[in-house]
Amino acid sequence: MLLNKKSLDCISAFASSDPTRYMLQGVHIEASGNMIATDGHILGILTPGDSLEEKDFPSIGQSAGDVPALVPCTLAIDGIKALSRAIPTKSRMPIVKHALLDHTATNANGKAVFHVTDLENPQVVNVAKLDGTFPNYVAVMPKDPTVYRIVFDAELLKRVATAALTLGKDQKETAIELEFTASGLSAMKATTTNKDGQTLTAVVMPLRGSRPREEYGLLVPAIIEDTVTT
């Protein structure tokens, strides 16, 4: 299994920093390569890409032979962050900008064993496994049919969230209310009010062009039609 810095940094943002929530202070890795993290309020699931193959990773001491399936495990968030820092970022070879998870060695003990190298300085990074059962995150996944789909530029959403946090910087938490039209093809209105009564209203245009128009908006008619025909 190959993991790069972007994926590790991305999923780490969802882990808990609360010392009383032991099993949430880590990243759960499944045999499929999916990485899951949650703090109990927000859940992140990162699905691996398939652009690179493990067999092309430089041989630097990883276990030989057939690669067994990974036994799912939860890795301590501090170790995940240390692993991210160890991954080379300046190599011209894309595969070197990854850490290779040694399935055989990881399955055999209480730590995950990763190999990283810049082709001159190979090293092994061990990340402690958390002893316990990761929450059943599948139970909180939405199961009802999707009735609405709309896409926004992540940078625009970040600007709205940053502005809202600036307005409510002295508050324990800042809420943003989102309003959509019935079609979902027009702008979204985001509103936040701070404790001083100041209100910010932001209007965010949807991202267009990345998918066919018919894939966006209210999907209820299609669902009703499927229900009737079946």
Located regions from the model:
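DNA polymerase processivity clamps
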Residues: 1-230
